Amino acid sequence: MVVGTGTSLALSSLLSLLLFAGMQMYSRQLASTEWLTIQGGLLGSGLFVFSLTAFNNLENLVFGKGFQAKIFPEILLCLLLALFASGLIHRVCVTTCFIFSMVGLYYINKISSTLYQATAPVLTPAKVTGKGKKRN
């Protein structure tokens, strides 16, 4: 099921806001054990993905279709937002958020490159026929 850019902007913005609020509401519980600090980093990575989706959808609405997110400022801004939100919970959450976000960004890039990049035809060089050195 595919939704439009405006609907995706609204949904991803709402999910980003709810995830940030949930992380702040349960920050004491997320910082209580080792496994929950890793879970806090995973939630921060989800915040990164949702905020990047919202930011890119907003750019597509403003600048037109086909506008792609670049490393600076879109990805860095969303990553810093997610790392800041994770840092409000625990400092280990920042590290796990960064690791999970980089893994998620790798797979997002891999999937989007297979879907949206057109393959350029490969040009093979023509065989040069001519006189070369004569061998005796």
Swiss-Prot record:
Pfam family, any one: Keratin_assoc
Alphabetically ordered keywords of this record: Endoplasmic reticulum, Membrane, Phosphoprotein, Transmembrane, Transmembrane helix
Listed pathway(s): Protein modification; protein glycosylation
Parts of the chain that traverse the membrane: 6-23, 35-55, 76-108
Side Cytoplasmic, residues: 24-34, 109-136
InterPro entries assigned: KRTCAP2
Topological domain ranges for the Lumenal compartment: 1-5, 56-75
GO (cellular component) term, any one: endoplasmic reticulum membrane
Membrane topology category: Multi-pass membrane protein
Extent of motif Prevents secretion from ER: 133-136
Function comment: Subunit of STT3A-containing oligosaccharyl transferase (OST-A) complex that catalyzes the initial transfer of a defined glycan (Glc(3)Man(9)GlcNAc(2) in eukaryotes) from the lipid carrier dolichol-pyrophosphate to an asparagine residue within an Asn-X-Ser/Thr consensus motif in nascent polypeptide chains, the first step in protein N-glycosylation. N-glycosylation occurs cotranslationally and the complex associates with the Sec61 complex at the channel-forming translocon complex that mediates protein translocation across the endoplasmic reticulum (ER).
Family: Belongs to the KRTCAP2 family.
UniProt-recorded name of the protein: Dolichyl-diphosphooligosaccharide--protein glycosyltransferase subunit KCP2
Phylogenetic placement of the source organism: Eukaryota, Metazoa, Chordata, Craniata, Vertebrata
Recorded name of the encoding gene: KRTCAP2
